[in-house]
Structure formats: structure tokens, C-alpha cells
């Protein structure tokens, strides 16, 4: 009898999962989303042209559940992405664009090395911008339940940008999560921080000047301080338990964990002068 119950339960979840991710169900989502988007001020023309062509992308769900930041320790993550080859490419990018990059670095007070490093990490200096249709990616993630509210908001923002001719809808290919351009900006980041640095009337985040200026503006707006180091060398009184290693910076900033970690760090006074871990 127990086996029968288990079979029924498993079958139910299989059927439920198949239904959630069926093409028919995604089509229903598109109809409902268009109604919602109209109320947000998106034009019917844009919705019919853009959303009607969107498709459900199963791979996007897989990528969302299996991100490198979730399962790779810090050393492995950095060693895979900070290679001598990338340093050579980065130096070449700077050599070919140093006037623009120096100007932007000075204007926004953001270290040029930081900007180049971010570009290298995000897109290998523009050599891999992503091949996913970000409209379909955002639609898939909006349809999915895990972070539907966030991605619905991002999709609405992107449609507003298209409606206002700020971004070109014919060139929207990027990451599985909907990020775009040399520095992988999400739609809300484009809306809030992107800069038309070359004054051509368009924001082109695949072009050097606009993308570097936008990234610099983003960092400046978030309060980046060139006088503070990116990393802090610490000395330990004793080993930190494994459960506290490789947690995100956001989690470390919680008051509870700061107080707990403090007893393990010998040179905590050194960190205090940078106001780190107490933000």
C-alpha cells in the first residue's frame, strides 16, 4: 500500500512539473503578461512584436539552478577567470582605447584597472557577450516561480527601454539571466546607470566608450571608493569553521556573523579603520 502511495505522489509531481513547463502553459503566461504590461504603459505594438516571438527556454531554468557562484569556492572561481591570457588581452584593450578609458576613469573617479578587470570577468573583454535571446530568457524566468517577481520587473523595464528607443530590440542577445553588453547590465541597471558617453543619441553597451562610462557610473553611484582596497589580508587566531567559509559578502555583513567571525580574526583593528564588516 505504501508503494502505491509513493507511486501516486511521484506521478503527481511529474505531471505537475510537466504542466508547469509546457508550451501551452507558457502561451497562457504570455497572454496574461501582455495584459499586465499594457497596464504598465507598454505599447501594444511593442508587446505584439516582442513578446509574441518569445519562447520558453528550458536551459535557462537549468542555468538558474546551477550557477558557478553557488558551488565553486573562491579560489577555484578566481583561478579559472584571472589568467595570464586575460591579462594580455586586457592590456591590449587598454592600449587601443587608453584615451577613452583614462578620460572615463578620471571623470567618474573609478580605477581603470577595476573597469578592465570587470570587463574581463563578465565577458572576456567583449569576446563572449552571450548568445541567448534575452527577451525569451527574461520571459522564461518571469514564467518560472523561483524569482518571478524580480524577472517580471526586469522584463517590463526592458520593454520600456525598447518602447523609448533607448535599446535596439534587434540586437538583444546576452546571458541566460537577461544581462547584456560588455559589462552584462540587467535592464534595471541600464535604466538607472547606462550613459550615452559618445553623445550619439543611443546607449550602446557593446561599444567601448558607452559601456565603460556606464560601468564607471554604476560603480560611482554605488559609492565605490578608490582609497579602499578590494581585498583585506587577515590573520587568524584559530581556524574558522567550514560552515562560515565561502559565504557571500552580503551574508558576512550581517551583524550576527560579524560578531561571530571577529573572535577568529587577530588583526580586526586593521579592518575597523576601513569600516569593513560593519557596514
Annotated model-derived regions:
Residues 41-279:
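Catalytic glycan-binding domains that act on GlcNAc-containing polysaccharides
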Residues 7, 12, 27, 110, ...:
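Generic hydrophobic-segment detector
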Amino acid at each position: 500500500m505504501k508503494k502505491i502511495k509513493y507511486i501516486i505522489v511521484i506521478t503527481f509531481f511529474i505531471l505537475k512539473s510537466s504542466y508547469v513547463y509546457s508550451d501551452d502553459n507558457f502561451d497562457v503566461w504570455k497572454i496574461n503578461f501582455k495584459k499586465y504590461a499594457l497596464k504598465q504603459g507598454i505599447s501594444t505594438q511593442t508587446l505584439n512584436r516582442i513578446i509574441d516571438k518569445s519562447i520558453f527556454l528550458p536551459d535557462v531554468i537549468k542555468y538558474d539552478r546551477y550557477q558557478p557562484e553557488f558551488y565553486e569556492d573562491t579560489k577555484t572561481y578566481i583561478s579559472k577567470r584571472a589568467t595570464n591570457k586575460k591579462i594580455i588581452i586586457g592590456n591590449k584593450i587598454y592600449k587601443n582605447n587608453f584615451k577613452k578609458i583614462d578620460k572615463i576613469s578620471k571623470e567618474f573617479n573609478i580605477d581603470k584597472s577595476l573597469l578592465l578587470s570587470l570587463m574581463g570577468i563578465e565577458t572576456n573583454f567583449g569576446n563572449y557577450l552571450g548568445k541567448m535571446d534575452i527577451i525569451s530568457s527574461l520571459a522564461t524566468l518571469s514564467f518560472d516561480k523561483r524569482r518571478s517577481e524580480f524577472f517580471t520587473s526586469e522584463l517590463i523595464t526592458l520593454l520600456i527601454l525598447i518602447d523609448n528607443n533607448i535599446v535596439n530590440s534587434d540586437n538583444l542577445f546576452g546571458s541566460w539571466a537577461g544581462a547584456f553588453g560588455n559589462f552584462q547590465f540587467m535592464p534595471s541597471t541600464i535604466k538607472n546607470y547606462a550613459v550615452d558617453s559618445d553623445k550619439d543619441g543611443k546607449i550602446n553597451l557593446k561599444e567601448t566608450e558607452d559601456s565603460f562610462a556606464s560601468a564607471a557610473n554604476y560603480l560611482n553611484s554605488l559609492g565605490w571608493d578608490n582609497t579602499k582596497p578590494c581585498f583585506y589580508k587577515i590573520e587568524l587566531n584559530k581556524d574558522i569553521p567550514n560552515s562560515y567559509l565561502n559565504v557571500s559578502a552580503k551574508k558576512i555583513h550581517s551583524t550576527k556573523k560579524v560578531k561571530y567571525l571577529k573572535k577568529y580574526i587577530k588583526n580586526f583593528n586593521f579592518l575597523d579603520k576601513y569600516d569593513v564588516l560593519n557596514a
